[in-house]
Amino acid sequence: MADYLLYESATGYSLFDVVGADQIAAKTKEVQLSLQDISKFGKVVQLRSFIPFKNAAHALENANDISEGVLNDFLKNFLELNLPKASKKKKVSLGVQDKNLATSIKSEIDAIECDTSELTQDLLRGIRFHGDKLLKQLSPGDFERAQLGLGHSYSRAKVKFNVNRNDNMIIQAIAILDQLDKDINTFAMRMKEWYSWHFPELSKIVGDNYKYAVIVTLVGDKTTINDEMLHDLAAVVDDDKDIAQSIINAGKVSMGQDISEIDLENILSFAERVIKLSNYRKQLHNYLVQKMNVVAPNLAELIGEMVGARLISHAGSLTNLSKCPASTVQILGAEKALFRALKTRGNTPKYGIIYHSSFIGKAGAKNKGRISRFLANKCSIASRIDNFSDAPTTAFGQVLRRQVEERLNFFDTGVAPTRNSIAMAEAYEKALSSVNIDGDEEVDIDVEETVETISEKPSKKEKKDKKEKKKEKSKKKRSADDASEEVKKSKKKKKSH
């Protein structure tokens, strides 16, 4: 049972004396009942010392240290000044809420023995419940204001840990892109049905939705179409004058009905809306590509920006994706098929979101499962490198992509791919050359040594040779032992005769 209790609050550090430690330990149920009543609980613990924080920044610094289990100088000096000196026979017992902080206090101050038992937690819970009444130095409302301010600053610091590498923007961007694709297709279909009453031949000549919308705004009423529009129409259809001329010819002999000015205005405004949505979709796609190259450059280099963004979105974050094993990455997005297969005891799916990768499409029907497993393994490695590396670089992604291409070639031609140890050593060397390390004179990393250590692993042939040598040695030993036994037996026979 602890003799003293350390209470960390938003206002400062408090040290409490535990009155009647033996009686409290014997009556744990009564202590739990007395937690709600301040008149009873005030007799169990008494305030020994209190030290407030200097300002809000100092409180945030101490809160971060406590959350990480670090004993800073401010808390260490407070404990050394207010706790009594321990004797040789008995140490000072201090009740602490956090176990990590307790271990750091033990390692820093030998005279203190920390206690994190259930009874200590109950007493600290009571102090936290009656904190504003036990700390009489504070005026009413100070405790709540300090908690609110510290909570906001602590949460803000955690959220703004790294603004540039925020994967939440990728999740939102890919979701908006998918929704925009659906909306643009729906709006373009309605626009074609609407304008086809007036100019039905245009939808057969121009199939692209964006180009169709631009031509609708350019032509307007088909009765106004003439040969002077040839260059403007050709600019829309990739400078193809034949298509532009066919549009003009079809407009002159179109079988569509006439249209009023009000109807045409609504059609044109709707076509402009489709054009704006398409332009915004292109802009958002470029933003997503740039964001992926900042947040997950290796994953984007390996599997592409769109597929990589969908993997991050489906996993919930880049951190969650990096924690997933390769087998989980392989079937991300195919959960329904997986559970259906498990329920019916059928074949489980071979791939999920990674099916949209170009590597799966290039592989043959027999090798799709193999390449999906290999690709999922490399995606798992790339996501972990992106998540836990301080300086983003595409060196590992380029090497991993080349490994997948070599594996595809191996399935088709049988040419052996590069060994993984050699490829990773090459990527490591590229990463070191691309990242500017502060103090290059002090940092001395020999890539050749790392390659040697990686390549020191014996090959399969070497292992077989070693096994054969061991077998030969064991046979020789057995033959020598048998020969010695025969000699001994012959000697015994001679002595007996």
Swiss-Prot record:
Region (Disordered): 448-497
Disulfide bond positions: none
Alphabetical list of PROSITE patterns matching this protein: NOP
Chain intervals with Basic and acidic residues compositional bias: 479-488
Places the protein is found: Nucleus, Nucleolus
Predominant location category: nucleus
Top-level taxon of origin: Eukaryota
GO-annotated cellular components: box C/D methylation guide snoRNP complex; nucleolus; nucleus; small nuclear ribonucleoprotein complex; small-subunit processome
Pfam family, one: Nop
Record-level GO BP terms: snoRNA guided rRNA 2'-O-methylation
Keyword Lyase: no
Basic residues biased stretches: 460-478
Domain (Nop) ranges: 295-413
Molecular-function GO term, any one: snoRNA binding
Signal sequence coordinates: none
Keywords for this protein: Nucleus, Ribonucleoprotein, Ribosome biogenesis
Keyword Iron-sulfur: no
Family according to the record: Belongs to the NOP5/NOP56 family.
Assembly: Component of the ribosomal small subunit (SSU) processome.
Function comment: Required for 60S ribosomal subunit synthesis.
This protein's name: Nucleolar protein 56
Organism of this sequence: Schizosaccharomyces pombe (strain 972 / ATCC 24843)
Taxonomic path: Eukaryota, Fungi, Dikarya, Ascomycota, Taphrinomycotina
Name of the gene: nop56
